[in-house]
A protein has these predicted regions:
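Cysteine-centered iron-sulfur cluster-binding motifs in ferredoxin-type domains/subunits
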Residues: 173-182
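The feature marks the mature, well-folded catalytic cores of soluble enzymes
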Residues: 1-174
């Protein structure tokens, strides 16, 4: 199940994203209400309006139930810090934090160019990312996760690093500039 609100709307509608940062921007409130009524069990059509707060609350309740049932979560990561083995998830809704803390097993999938050497480097990227992607000073949620801790969060962890031809691009003196994009 997709946990980002806009991605959830797209998934429940069996639709395709229309924008990389705002995947459901092509859907109006009335459409979203109808999608929720059709896909989320237990919603009352007589009380659910197309008010954004009500729609967000319906999605929150739906997702919370899924989070509490999930034994395994698959998450991405914005950065991985080699110095400490820390993964960083930057987001605006708190859904990533739920993935990092509630399931028994966490599987994180990350492109290799997201691996950075030190905490000092992370500080720079945490300032650049929100300014570059959404023109914000900072993201609402930044979660840092440094592995399994007995009795706290996932007790099993797997990191999948994806290359996708990036090492070939990195080896190319001209092509490597393409990997500078955060």
């Amino acid at each position: 199940i997709e946990t980002d609100l806009a991605e959830l709307i797209v998934q429940l509608a069996d639709d395709r994203p229309s924008h990389i940062l705002v995947p459901a921007i092509h859907r109006g409130r009335a459409e979203i209400r109808q999608i929720f009524l059709e896909a989320m069990p237990g919603l009352d059509p007589g009380t659910l309006t197309d008010d954004p707060r009500q729609l967000a609350e319906a999605a929150r309740a739906y997702l919370r139930e899924a989070f509490l049932r999930a034994r395994v979560a698959v998450s991405g990561a914005n950065f991985g810090v080699v110095e400490t083995g820390t993964l960083t998830v930057v987001e605006s809704e708190g859904n990533g934090r739920m993935c990092l803390t509630l399931p028994e097993t966490l599987i994180t999938v990350m492109w290799i160019e997201k691996v950075i050497p030190t905490w000092r480097d992370l500080e720079v990227f945490l300032q650049l990312l929100p300014r570059s992607s959404t023109a914000e000073r900072m993201n609402p949620y930044t979660s840092l996760w440094t592995g399994v801790q007995p009795g706290d969060g996932p007790q099993e962890f797997h990191l999948v690093l994806l290359d996708g031809g990036r090492t070939d691009v990195l080896a190319d003196e001209v092509g490597r500039a393409a990997l500078h994009c955060i």
